[in-house]
Amino acid sequence: AFEEYGMRDAEIAARYYQKLKAFAETHTDSSSVPATASGLAVRILLSQLEQQGTSFHETFGFEERTGVYWNNVKGSVVTRKSTVPTEMRSITEPFVSKCYHGGRNECYTFGPTPVSVWNDFDLAGAYTTGLVDLRPIDYDNFWYTKDERAFVGHVVGFALVDFEFPADTKFPCLPVEGSNGGLFYPLSGRSYCTAPEIEVALGMNCSLNILHGVIIPWCDAEDGGDSRIFEEFT
């Protein structure tokens, strides 16, 4: 019985690999299977962008550079190509990276909970909806501002702010990174945050002082600004 169980497990793995390989061939024109599901997803996206005639480098602010290096094994100079952020993207990237914190995960109750009806609300298709909302952005024409209203609306914006929510605010929305890397959402403090977070905070009557802010505009229509990068992918 155990031998049969083991053989069955091997069969399941083999069948899964065969189907995954066929899926990869259909959607990426490649017979090799990436080691992870996310790797396969990236390959599918790149394949779809190529089919649409969309430049990955232009869309995401990358460029290909050629460098000359000394190869100790060959004992000679070799030429190597690499994909790197454009110079204009590189200017804002360190600051923008500080403003990204990932999802908000919190626990509001510790220990036994009261007997009651508990509701867990979720946004249907939140990730795919967020992806479809993204359009090409103009990395070369970013601009700085301390005007809080510039961060309201459909804006690609990032800022370092001092903030203070009203004392009776139950759930403040601006993230502050702790010394251990965790996130806190205090009534007041200093936050690296994004335009949507700023707009929500303003809607909660939060007092803001923008110390440093950058806006990266969407591309104009003639430069592909009307296209949705991930629409076909999702």
Feature-to-residue mapping (PLM):
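Conserved acidic
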Residues: 1-234
